[in-house]
Amino acid sequence: MLRIDYDLKTGPVIVIFCSGLKPEFYANTKDFSRVFLYDTESLWFQKEIDSIRRFLDSIPDKTMTLGVSRGGYAALLFGHLYGLRVLAFSPQTRLYDDRWPEIKEARKVSKHTEFFDLSFVEGRNTVYFCKDNPKDEEHASRIKAEIHLVDGKQHNSASVLKSQGKLGDVIHTFTHSE
């Protein structure tokens, strides 16, 4: 099931695909209108692709997508589909990763097998991942993106950046650049 929250102001809209992180994690986006999409079933947004597309079609002034892990997958997918700038932390780019047992269920419920592999994704993509995490490096290397390495081996590079006091600067720099 898809849950949507929003904080609308005037001006550009950031679409944030949430994979379990609370909205306050994205505090550095508060100067923008924000739409938060939550994949409450942890299925890489696969059950809701058509609903998300209809919803995004109705939002003017979309400028960027943002997400972490499976939210990063969705940020890349919908950023590509809508020609938006993307900031993704440790995203999956193929729905074939044995680290998450739910990924098999995501493939089973999806109506869009063409999105199981995002190697076709192009655009203005910025991806962060921990440099000592070979699986995340493999995912990131499959797409066209500006790559940033984070010290560490964890999967969640955004949490690592937050613990280092750097996440706010990363998000601010991304959201305030063209």
Task: List each language-model region with its residue ranges.
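Gly/Ala-rich beta-loop-alpha elbow adjacent to hydrolase catalytic centers
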Residues: G67-G71, A75
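Short, structured coil segments at secondary-structure junctions
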Residues: K30-D31, Y82, I143
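Active-site nucleophile loop of the alpha/beta-hydrolase fold
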Residues: L87-D98
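Active-site catalytic motif of lipid deacylating hydrolases and related acyltransferases
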Residues: L2-I59
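Active-site signature of alpha/beta-hydrolase-fold catalytic machinery across serine-
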Residues: L77-L81
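The feature captures the conserved acid-bearing segment of alpha/beta-hydrolase catalytic domains
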Residues: E102-E178
